[in-house]
Amino acid sequence: YTPREFSLAQNYPNPFNPTTEISFAMDVASDVNLTIYNMLGQKVKVLENAYLAGGTHTYTWNGQDELGQSVSTGVYLYTLTSGNQTISKKMALMK
């Protein structure tokens, strides 16, 4: 099954603790970057940065940054970029 559009789903569960799933769909194969930012715009974690086939993809975030440290309670932004398209959504970590 190949989706008909580029889309980013709301993470589930939301709010989450300690993990959440982020899913997105692509109609064609493309370079993809899925990154989590804090509300100050600082990069927290890169979940994916690769060339992926068209279809639906799901990633799990464990609430940790690039150094493996647990991040604090709060709202985070996850951003999906593919080609010239970017979609962002908010999620909340509650401890």
Tell what function each PLM region has.
Residues 1-12, 16-37, 46-49, 53, ...:
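Glycine-centered coil/turn sites that cap beta-strands in beta-rich domains
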Residues 59-71:
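Signal that preferentially marks extracellular ectodomain short beta-strand elements
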